[in-house]
Amino acid sequence: MTPPLPGFRDVRVVVAGDLMLDRYWHGATQRISPEAPVPVVRVDGAEERPGGAANVALNVAALGGEAQVVGPTGSDEAADRLAELLEAAGVGQRFHRIAGADTITKLRVISRHQQLIRLDFERGFPGFDHAAMLALLEPALADAAVLVLSDYAKGALPDPAGLIEAARRAGRPVLVDPKGADYRRYRGASLLTPNLAEFEAVVGPCADGDEIAKRARQLAADLELEALLVTRGEAGMTLAPREGVAVHLPTRAREVFDVTGAGDTVIATLAAALGAGVDLADASALANVAAGVVVGKLGTATVTPAELEAALGGGPAPAAGSGVVDEPGLLAAVRQARAAGERIVMTNGCFDLLHAGHVDYLQRARRRGERLVVAVNDDASVARLKGAERPVTPLAQRMAVLAALDTVDWVVPFSEDTPARLIEAVLPDRLVKGGDYQPEQIAGHDVVVAAGGSVEVLPLLAGASTTDLIARIRSRG
């Protein structure tokens, strides 16, 4: 039986480890290069997300907890961008910036939802040692409920055992996502969360779940751990406490699109649940459900409480249309969506007398990301742009009809002649406009592009316009 969803609101989690910036280039692949037998990708979109230890913290924040990251970075543009992304998601940062070092960056090229290649940018962190990490960590532990060590063997955790000892002295449980074959580095931790390949690299091949549990319990005893949670892909997970009965949790995934970052979601959900007072068995069951949700998403992603509640069967799946919002409500919703790794698409218009052309356009706009914001001119703004006889339909009715479309997430009004100020506040990943404009002519173009987003013009459905519709109505008396 899966436990009910706890409240994560006041749970504070510190995540120490290898901080990364994940970058994605998206595009179509239709031919092979004449220069070499490789596909040519025409890039038409790019996005950035926190990765590694930063993605663990992002997952905690997406669940509603308070998260802070601790670790080394370069003193470079990637570190600045990572800080901006974390700040936007409400995640605190304690970076140790090192001049001349690279912030760990992974660039993935994606076409048709398939990863074609990954390029890694990293050179290590010269001079960063245990004392430096401990100095970063100790102040953060003061008001934390749980410490997570996210180890990708990139140099952020030169002595994890020393950090574990410091956390245990402070009375904080320590969860570790381990790396490498020497788990003695993690002696005294509360819990390790290796995947099956990592686990078997330490203990040897295991024939079945029972053997996994047996060897995990022995390893827990040898290393003075409370338990191990071994993630096993399509076979689910095995929780093996040092004392007590092992539990095998079958997978909850319905579809698997991408396992990138799934381990981050598991340990983040465990940390948030344990910090909320859930026992280890129930916290592991929740983490298993969260993993089943996140592998159904593309790229490094997160899980929201609504998604977790729906997966638990305790509530409806999050609705695509979240209704009419004011600007503060929109910005709060966008922050939550970004914390969940969702791309924000934004468009705007009068949308007077909604017709098939509008519906077709909004459907195509929504396919550019996971969330669609529609900014709507208020009545006075429409009158200034279209003339005193417009709008035909008042603002409240126009917004209500738009919000009823399953392609639209949020509808927000604006009173200016252009939504430039609102666009700057939202900073969508992709700004979309219908018509025959040049992208540079679209309000908000410069700020969106400067923030790393893109601007796209979509052609409108021929023969469908509000002006023509009004003319036809008038011609029929």
UniProtKB/Swiss-Prot annotation:
Pathway: Nucleotide-sugar biosynthesis; ADP-L-glycero-beta-D-manno-heptose biosynthesis; ADP-L-glycero-beta-D-manno-heptose from D-glycero-beta-D-manno-heptose 7-phosphate: step 1/4; Nucleotide-sugar biosynthesis; ADP-L-glycero-beta-D-manno-heptose biosynthesis; ADP-L-glycero-beta-D-manno-heptose from D-glycero-beta-D-manno-heptose 7-phosphate: step 3/4. Its EC number is 2.7.1.167, 2.7.7.70. It holds the Pfam family CTP_transf_like. InterPro entries: Bifunc_HldE, Carboh/pur_kinase_PfkB_CS, Cyt_trans-like, PfkB_dom, RfaE_dom_I, RfaE_dom_II, Ribokinase-like, Rossmann-like_a/b/a_fold. Residues 346-477 are annotated as: Cytidylyltransferase. In the N-terminal section; belongs to the carbohydrate kinase PfkB family. In the C-terminal section; belongs to the cytidylyltransferase family. NCBIfam families: cyt_tran_rel, PRK11316.1, rfaE_dom_I, rfaE_dom_II. This is Bifunctional protein HldE. The lineage of its organism: Bacteria, Pseudomonadati, Pseudomonadota, Gammaproteobacteria, Chromatiales. The gene is hldE.
